[in-house]
Amino acid sequence: MSIINKIFISLILVLFTTSLLAEEVKKVGKFKDWETLVLTKSDGIVCFAQSKPVLQSPKKNKRDSRLFVSFRPNEKILDEISLTAGYEFNKQNSITAKSGKFKYKFDISQEKFAWIADNKVEKKMIRTMKKGSRIMISGYNSSGSQTIDHYSLLGFTKAYNEAK
C-alpha cells in the first residue's frame, strides 16, 4: 500500500471518528416565539426549549441572550431553568425573573450563565410561564450596569411539552 493511500485512509478514519464524537444539535420544532432542540452528546441527550428576547434594554448593547428549560434524562435532571444574558454576571447583584406578580431569583451564576438552585422554584416558575404572556429577566454586568430582557411566552407551553 502506498504512503498516499495510507494517509488517505488515516484521514478518513480521523474524520469519521471525529464526527461520531461531535455533539449534534437538532431543531425539533418552532412554536411561535419558542423552539425545541435536542443536543446529542456521547453521554446522553439534552432536550430543551429556548427563546430569545423580544425586547432588550439598553438597546445599544446587542447581546446574545437566551432563556432555556432543559431536560437531561441520563442525569435525572428535569425542568432546569437557565439563562444567558450574553455577558458575565456581576456577583454582587441579583438576577431575577418577573412575570405578573411573580418574581424568581437565579441563585447560581457562572460566567455568562445563571440557574435557579431549587427545583421546586423552577417548577413554580414553569407554571407561571405556562400561564403568562411575557417574562422579564433583570441582571447586572461586571461593571454594575443593569440589563433587562423581555421574553414572549407565546409558544412556551408547546415547546416545553415537546422538550419534555
Give residue ranges: language-model regions.
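N-terminal signal peptide c-region/cleavage motif recognized by signal peptidases
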Residues: T17-T18
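N-terminal secretory targeting signals
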Residues: I3, L21-A22
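A generic "folded-domain core" signal
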Residues: A22-K164
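Bacterial N-terminal signal peptides that target proteins for export
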Residues: M1-I9
